[in-house]
Amino acid sequence: MKITTKVLIIGSGPAGLSAAIYAARASLNPILINGIQPGGQLTITTDVENYPGFAESVQGPWLMEQMRMQAENVGTKIVNDYVEKVDLSQRPFKVSTGSRTEYEAESIIICTGAEARWLGIPTEQEFMGFGVSACATCDGFFFKNQKVVVVGGGNSAVEEALYLTNHASKVTIVHRRDNFRAEKILQERLFKNPKISVIWDHVVEEIVGNNNPKSVTGVKIQNVHTKETSLVNCSGVFVAIGHKPNTALFAEQVTMDNDNYIITTPGSTKTNIEGVFAAGDVQDKIYRQAITAAGTGCMAALEAEKFLNK
């Protein structure tokens, strides 16, 4: 089956749904392809306290459901499918999905997001949202005056640890090596902070916790040399071993940086291909927040409208 559209949005997180809302209100009749994880990363987030408009915290899945309904109510067609292949060599752009549907689009907004790199250990997924996080800015507030562990040794880990000292009583970094890869200025700030301690040459083997109520109580760590294990008591575990953008579909077509994030024109969502725009975490390695993703989704829709009206 072949379907034609003016605007095709790939991805259904805050960026994709915001783009859909603005595109629909501009009478562009957008089609949005949900992807494998409808709603994006917020669907695995419990309490959301930093999205404007809500005096009390809201649940991530509920927030994304509201965005989805809003997008549909203003005229977006949302398709439960995922993209398998993209051809951006000429307009109309061609997109093939898992259901064997072929789309031809005059413009495309890429909102496929990014995902945290996880440890891949037992109980990590079990305590996701119940003490395990990959975003200190999002979840640090919930650990006021509590002990937390940060896993990692790069810029992300050090920055997360420094941020968490604003909330936690103690921050312990567990790193598998005997030195950090982080920038020297960040390391200097970290070593000067009395709230932070570092456990070198260790890896996290297991996250320990309770089931009623579900909560983290500590991490079991192992020395990479001696193989001895020990327990570090904590209420939260922040995994900071990097993020990876979901950009494999667009490789060798859209220009990306060394970390495979899509490069956009400064102050814009335009990519190197005219008529193709990118919004949200897929082009943002710095902020990675729902509100910034939504903002760039809005920008992409407005820029797509302007492009189509040329």
Curated annotation (Swiss-Prot):
One of its GO terms (biological process) is removal of superoxide radicals. Disulfide bonds join C135-C138. One of its GO terms (molecular function) is thioredoxin-disulfide reductase (NADPH) activity. InterPro entries: FAD/NAD-bd_sf, FAD/NAD-binding_dom, Ferredoxin-NADP_redctase_2, Pyr_nucl-diS_OxRdtase_2_AS, Thioredox_Rdtase. PROSITE patterns: PYRIDINE_REDOX_2 (PS00573). It is an enzyme of class 1 (oxidoreductase). It catalyses: [thioredoxin]-dithiol + NADP(+) = [thioredoxin]-disulfide + NADPH + H(+). Keywords: Cytoplasm, Disulfide bond, FAD, Flavoprotein, NADP, Oxidoreductase, Redox-active center. It comes from the Bacteria. Binds 1 FAD per subunit. Homodimer. The active site is a redox-active disulfide bond. Belongs to the class-II pyridine nucleotide-disulfide oxidoreductase family. Its cofactor is FAD. This is Thioredoxin reductase. PANTHER family: THIOREDOXIN REDUCTASE 1-RELATED-RELATED (PTHR48105). Its EC number is 1.8.1.9. GO terms for cellular component: cytoplasm. It is found in: Cytoplasm. FAD binds at residues 34-41, 281-290.
